[in-house]
């Protein structure tokens, strides 16, 4: 890039750099954002379709989970990646609503594009969008429905709503019960860490055969076949070390002149190992999990005492075992006491999906649990896992916040109506941006209708009519196209899913709108600059960006499919 300075050109950027400015830059970025939103739009709602994603190695993923789709698409365009970050933030914060947030973000950009063509400045749009978002969150807070932590029925409805439209939908009755029981088990005064709910996938059987284990499954086997296969009324020791003779930290040489001396060394090692096992026995342990190895001789003594032992357990398994059973890990087995032991009704080695694993179950008030998910194929089980993770997230958020909203496009329709009224009180051109924000929110009920095969205009008119008459919880029944009361039908989702979606979508849209200059360094040009392909300029993206930054023409593999 060069600029004139007098009669001499002033070189500012390298020859490989590419720059797009003004309306071209805005148009390119808006197009990228809209393309991302369009790629997941058909997955929204209970009648949403799935996507098949195939990576460079031939691995196949079949899903309609928004964030999974966007991650697997390997998008390179920087503006498009801002929209992907919206989905990732939504997934991290609340676990569901990723598609909603992305679709709203894309529609905000689409509405903004129309206003930009009418010479409304981008900063005016950004300011209006922010005002509308703040008002929307305020209105949502006022309309939220309170729910208590022990309202299991409502929590199950929330979990089921998160599974609707996914591969687990047919078994959502069974799975929602498992999810709620799991989250309630690990909750500490409404503070929930879903890491304490471990998910184990098993290929084979029906989804309905999935189960909740009140305890921990350790992906290990007992260290010796001579040990008991199962132990009832287990007293569990967690040894944060191995049952082995410790090596010295310094190199030493010992000259052995007599075979008896060698035997004395071996006897001494054996005695140390026996003392370790005796310490466990005296403490009352009949199950041992060791962080490191277990010597063969120690295995012999453990088996002789009827103690079931597992070696090289993972650190996260130790954490779960400690939380589930109440055991306290000890670093020196010789210091173990009865108070350090945890308790479980049963510890047994069982076959699960062709693999032998250790089941620690029947734990009283377990604070760490395991969900065993089953499905006919690997793809089915993977999709069930994604649905379960979403459900765990929304139940966690509901327990933490205690507030929910009706689903089915009801809150978006109500917000759109109230924001249009609010726009009348907003001065200047920001009023147009607030109205555009209201229009953008209606993309949710409109898309729900489209994906279900209903007329989106008729559905939206019916929804507006119901809300205008004061039915604020009226939403679209995607199965038959009727407008129904979402709360009474049990179609609800956490308040934070909606507020986070609006917040993230607005931030991403305003950030993209404020960009009026895009400069791509040579190494971001997708390898096209300088390529001897016979073209005088880079191909692909609008606004002259070419292959730079992934190129809108390619979108990192999205291409013309959108």
From Swiss-Prot:
The keyword Heme is annotated on this UniProt entry: no
A GO BP annotation: protein folding
Transmembrane segments: none
Entry keyword set: ATP-binding, Chaperone, Nucleotide-binding
Composition bias, Gly residues: 537-551
Function: Molecular chaperone; binds unfolded polypeptides in vitro, and has a weak ATPase activity.
Sequence similarity: Belongs to the TCP-1 chaperonin family.
Protein name stated in the entry: Thermosome subunit alpha
Species name: Halobacterium salinarum (strain ATCC 700922 / JCM 11081 / NRC-1)
């Amino acid at each position: 890039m060069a600029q004139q300075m007098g009669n001499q050109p002033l070189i500012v950027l390298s020859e490989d750099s590419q720059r797009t400015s003004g309306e071209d830059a805005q148009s390119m970025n808006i197009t990228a954002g809209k393309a991302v939103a369009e790629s997941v739009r058909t997955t929204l709602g209970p009648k949403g379709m799935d996507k098949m994603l195939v990576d460079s190695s031939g691995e196949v993923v079949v899903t309609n989970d928004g964030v999974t789709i966007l991650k697997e698409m390997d998008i390179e365009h920087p503006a498009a990646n801002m929209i992907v970050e919206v989905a990732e933030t939504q997934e991290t914060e609340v676990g569901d609503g990723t598609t909603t947030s992305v679709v709203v973000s894309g529609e905000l950009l689409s509405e903004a594009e129309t206003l930009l063509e009418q010479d409304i400045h981008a900063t005016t749009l950004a300011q209006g969008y922010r005002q509308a978002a703040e008002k929307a969150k305020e209105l949502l807070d006022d309309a939220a429905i309170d729910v208590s932590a022990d309202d299991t029925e409502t929590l199950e409805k929330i979990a089921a709503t998160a599974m609707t439209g996914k591969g687990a939908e047919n078994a959502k009755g069974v799975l929602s019960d498992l999810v709620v029981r799991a989250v309630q088990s690990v909750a500490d005064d409404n503070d929930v860490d879903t890491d304490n709910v471990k998910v184990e996938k098993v290929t084979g059987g029906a989804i309905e055969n999935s189960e909740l284990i009140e305890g921990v499954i350790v992906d290990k086997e007992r260290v010796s076949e001579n040990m008991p296969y199962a132990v009832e009324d287990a007293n569990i020791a967690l040894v944060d070390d191995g049952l082995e003779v410790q090596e010295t930290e310094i190199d030493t040489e010992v000259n052995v002149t007599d075979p008896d001396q060698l035997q004395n060394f071996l006897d001494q090692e054996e005695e140390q190992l026996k003392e370790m096992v005796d310490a466990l026995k005296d403490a009352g342990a009949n199950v041992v999990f060791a962080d490191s190895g277990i010597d063969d001789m120690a295995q012999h003594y453990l088996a002789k005492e009827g103690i079931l032992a597992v070696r090289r357990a993972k650190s996260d398994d130790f954490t779960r075992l400690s939380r589930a059973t109440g055991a306290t890990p000890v670093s020196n087995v010789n210091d173990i006491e009865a108070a350090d032991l945890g308790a479980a009704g049963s510890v047994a080695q069982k076959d699960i999906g062709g693999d032998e694993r250790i089941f620690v179950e029947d734990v009283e008030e377990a604070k760490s649990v395991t969900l065993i998910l089953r499905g006919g194929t690997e793809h089915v089980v993977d999709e069930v896992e994604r649905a379960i993770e979403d459900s765990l997230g929304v139940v966690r958020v509901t327990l933490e916040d205690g507030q929910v909203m009706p689903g089915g496009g009801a809150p978006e329709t109500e917000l759109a109506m109230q924001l249009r009224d609010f726009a009348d009180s907003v001065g200047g051109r920001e009023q147009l941006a607030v109205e555009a924000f209201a229009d953008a929110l209606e993309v949710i009920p409109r898309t729900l209708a489209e994906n279900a095969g209903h007329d989106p205009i008729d559905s939206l008119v019916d929804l507006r009519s119901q809300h205008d008459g004061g039915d604020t919880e009226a939403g679209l029944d995607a199965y038959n196209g009727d407008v129904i009361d979402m709360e009474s039908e049990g179609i609800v989702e956490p308040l934070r899913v909606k507020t986070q979606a609006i917040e993230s979508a607005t931030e991403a849209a305003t950030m993209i709108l404020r960009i009026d200059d895009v400069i791509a360094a040579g190494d971001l040009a997708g390898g096209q600059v300088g390529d001897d392909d016979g073209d005088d300029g880079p191909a692909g993206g609008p606004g002259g960006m070419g292959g730079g930054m992934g190129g809108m023409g390619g979108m990192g593999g999205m291409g013309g499919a959108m």
